[in-house]
Each structure stands twice: as C-alpha cells, then as structure tokens.
UniProtKB/Swiss-Prot annotation:
The gene is rpmD. This is Large ribosomal subunit protein uL30. InterPro entries: Ribo_uL30_ferredoxin-like_sf, Ribosomal_uL30_bac-type, Ribosomal_uL30_ferredoxin-like. One of its GO terms (biological process) is translation. Keywords: Ribonucleoprotein, Ribosomal protein. GO terms for cellular component: cytosolic large ribosomal subunit. It comes from Xanthomonas campestris pv. campestris (strain ATCC 33913 / DSM 3586 / NCPPB 528 / LMG 568 / P 25). PANTHER family: LARGE RIBOSOMAL SUBUNIT PROTEIN UL30M, MITOCHONDRIAL RIBOSOMAL PROTEIN L30.
Length: 63
C-alpha cells in the first residue's frame, strides 16, 4: 500500500444551512458536514476546493 503524502485541508461549518440554496446545501453535505461546528479533514484536491469556493460564506478553512 502506498503512503498518502497528499496535503489535507480542515473545513468547519460555521453557519447554518437554513435559507441557503439547495445546490449549496448539497455541496456542504458532499464535504461531509452536517451540523454547525462539524469539522472534516479532506484531501486537498481541485474538486474539494471547488466545493469550498461554492459555499465559502458557510465554511471556514483551517489549513
């Protein structure tokens, strides 16, 4: 098994999803975030960065 040497990024949901667009709610769930203050450590990839850019006003990125 190869070692995982890729960088990771921590994402925290800091705002609730009430009143947001359904597309943005789906993006937050795709990041694995469900409740306020949920934190996920994700592999830093263009796909993840795109999801973060979509919901930048709902999440906080902790490198």
């Amino acid at each position: 098994m190869a070692k995982d040497t890729g960088k990771t990024v921590k994402v925290r949901l800091v705002r609730g999803l009430r009143g947001t667009q359904s597309r943005h709610r789906l993006s937050v769930h795709a990041l694995g975030l469900n409740k306020i203050n949920d934190v996920r450590e994700l592999k830093d990839s263009p796909q993840v960065r795109g999801l973060i850019n979509t919901v930048h006003y709902l999440v906080k990125v902790e490198d």
